[in-house]
């Protein structure tokens, strides 16, 4: 992952990840599953746009296990994919963000929208689509107020879901 300046205020963003997970020892579920992510993007001044393709394989019996992951942050805020389905997870997404620059009353306000299209990695199942929206505003130097909205529209996995969060974060 990294950034490459492309002139002026422009920056090319990139992330590429790969991992392989397989059974161990006398595990009766024999498997070898891949994880990969490709995420190019661009940042111009206070705005950024990224497109990503993430794949957590499944073989129909077991999905890639990520017991220490926070998939809420990566695979949608509606939390439909906190564990990988047995048929895997394919996530194509677009992520746009803008942080208000300057010293005015809206300075530091961050707006973000993310769209996901989910499907399986085996079996050709269209899981659904999800929209996420976020507004985050600093309250002084120690606090941040955040509102998040998630809307999941199911096709072949789970149920339609809408979630709304309000958070106050503090820095110690």
Could you tell me what each predicted segment is?
Residues 89-138:
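C-terminal hydrophobic structural anchor segments
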Residues 29-74:
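Long, well-ordered mid-to-C-terminal structural blocks that present hydrophobic/aromatic surfaces
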Residues 18-24, 44-46, 53-59, 100, ...:
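Transmembrane beta-strands of outer-membrane beta-barrel pores
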Residues 5-14, 46-50, 102-111, 139-147:
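Repeated loop/turn-to-beta-strand initiation elements of outer-membrane beta-barrel proteins
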Residues 1-7, 41-45, 97-101, 136-142, ...:
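Structural signature of outer-membrane beta-barrel channels/translocons
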Residues 94-96, 160-172:
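Outer-membrane beta-barrel "beta-signal"
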Residues 1-33, 145, 165-169:
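Surface-exposed extracellular loop regions of Gram-negative outer-membrane beta-barrel proteins
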């Amino acid at each position: 992952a990294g950034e490459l300046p492309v002139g002026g205020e422009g920056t090319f963003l990139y992330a590429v990840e790969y991992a392989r997970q397989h059974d161990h020892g006398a595990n009766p579920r024999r498997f070898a599953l891949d994880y990969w992510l490709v995420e190019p993007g661009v940042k111009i001044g206070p705005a950024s746009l990224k497109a990503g393709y993430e794949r957590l394989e499944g073989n129909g019996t077991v999905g890639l296990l990520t017991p220490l992951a926070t998939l809420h942050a990566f695979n949608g805020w509606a939390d439909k994919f906190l564990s990988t389905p047995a048929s895997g997870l394919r996530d194509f997404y677009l992520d746009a963000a803008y942080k208000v620059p300057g010293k005015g009353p809206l300075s530091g306000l961050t707006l973000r929208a993310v769209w996901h299209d989910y499907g399986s990695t085996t079996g050709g199942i269209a899981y659904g689509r999800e929209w996420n929206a976020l507004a985050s505003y600093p309250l002084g130097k120690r606090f941040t107020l955040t509102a998040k909205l998630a809307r999941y529209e199911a096709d072949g996995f789970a149920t339609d879901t809408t979630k709304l969060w309000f958070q106050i974060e503090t820095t110690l």
